[in-house]
């Protein structure tokens, strides 16, 4: 049997409140093989992101790993020195955050930030890393891959920036990547495109990945196995097909039921005869670029109008 790349045993984490340490993660086990994607799913506060950081041997300020072990390719990350961890992070272990915009320096071009990791770790020269960056942009389906890296972060869309961050994480060809809800802020269409490109590149490089999310649709597309967390406890773990078709625990079943909209819907409010707000035939432009074309809608008392559209469309 192949040895796991990542193995976490009995991991407990605590958070400090005043002088008291309170439990956050209550003895979770986790194994991950090369090329495998594990989905970590649970509601807000379940401990997903905290466990994801612990998988790299790190914690946020005010959090500690109080029990358990974390081994990456035979290296005990909880006993490893700071220099050993620095050598691993970015080169063999990478992290993709929820906010791509916050992860980039707005004063530097995308490609300049992309080459930092490979050159600092001695993986490639600057020229080699720039050429490889273009190839990664192409694999991640970024438009105009030869030139998009010469733009600044504010000059690309949210979905493009998220893929550029994934390219940066893959630059050193890490063995393990932690994806911490990287598509949460994206619209559905862009999210599907980004997820497909991430899944493709992870498979191409046989990279192990932990994908953290609260979205069942996302985890169904990304994960080979799913681990469900609730308030720091592991609820159940199974391969994706089994988890989606035949969950065993009541909490997991309730998550699936919510996603399936099995709850009764509210009865619609009867619209008032006269709308509170009436917008008719609105058109708008940024300079010479039209952005709204003959838009009309009414808003009635007690009712809500939802405006839905992709990123870069103009919402009223």
How would you name each of these model-derived features?
Residues 64, 76-94, 112, 120, ...:
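ABC ATPase NBD coupling module
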Residues 171-175:
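A short, proline-enriched helix->beta-strand linker immediately N-terminal to the Walker B motif
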Residues 64-76, 309:
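Conserved ABC transporter NBD signature motif
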Residues 6, 25-27, 277, 292:
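Conserved structural motif at the start of ABC-family nucleotide-binding domains
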Residues 219-221:
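A short, surface-exposed alpha-helical micro-motif characterized by mixed small hydrophobic
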Residues 314-316:
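Conserved small/polar residues in nucleotide/adenosyl-binding loops
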